[in-house]
Amino acid sequence: MKRIVIVGTTGSGKTTLAKALADKMGLVHIDLDDLHHMPGWKERPADDFRRLLTEATRAENWAVAGNYAGKAQDITWPQADTLIWCDMPYWINFWRLLERTVRRAYTGEMVCNGNTEPFFKQFYSKDSILWWFLKTWHKNRKKYNAVFANPQDYPHLKLIRLRSYKQAREFLDKA
C-alpha cells in the first residue's frame, strides 16, 4: 500500500484513518476537504482544486481522504493501489458525527483551512454536516456497494471494506 484512497460518508473516519496511515507508513496525507474548502467555507474553483490535487498526488506515496467523485476520482483512483471504504453502520456513523459536530461547535475547533462549524449552522441550516450525512449516506453506500461488487472493473486496486471502527483499528494495527 503506497497510494491509498479512503472513501465513505461524512463522519465515517476517512480523515482519521488517512492521517493515521500516513503517520504510520510515511505517506503524504491529502485531505480533499482541505483542498476543496477555502476560508469562510468558500468552495475552491474546480480547476484550482484539481490542479492542487494533481500536484499533491505527484508524491510517490500518499493517503487521500475524501469522495469528491466528480472532481477527484479520475485523478486519484487510476494512480492508487488501494481503495479503502469506511462503511460504518448508519446509526453508529450518525452518532459519532453528532458527537463530533457538538464538540466542534462547542470548542470552535478549526477545520478545513481555519473554518469553524458554528452551532446554528450545524443544527438549524441546510448547510449542516448532519443534513449532508442524511442526504448522502444511502447514495454513497449504493455507489461503493457497486464498486466492491465488481472488483474486475478496478483490477489495479486492492479493495478493503471496513465495516466497524473496531475493524478499522485492527486494520491500522496491522498496516
Residue ranges and their predicted role:
Residues 24, 131-175:
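NTP-dependent small-molecule kinase module
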Residues 17:
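Hydrophobic positions on the alpha1 helix immediately C-terminal to the Walker A/P-loop
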Residues 28-83, 88:
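Conserved nucleotide-sensing/catalytic segment adjacent to the nucleotide-binding pocket
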Residues 14:
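Conserved lysine of the Walker
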Residues 6:
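Hydrophobic anchor at the beta1->P-loop junction of P-loop NTPases
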Residues 10:
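The conserved Walker
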Residues 88-140:
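A glycine- and Lys/Arg-enriched "phosphate-lid" helix/loop adjacent to the NTP-binding pocket
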Residues 20:
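Active-site signature of alpha/beta-hydrolase-fold catalytic machinery across serine-
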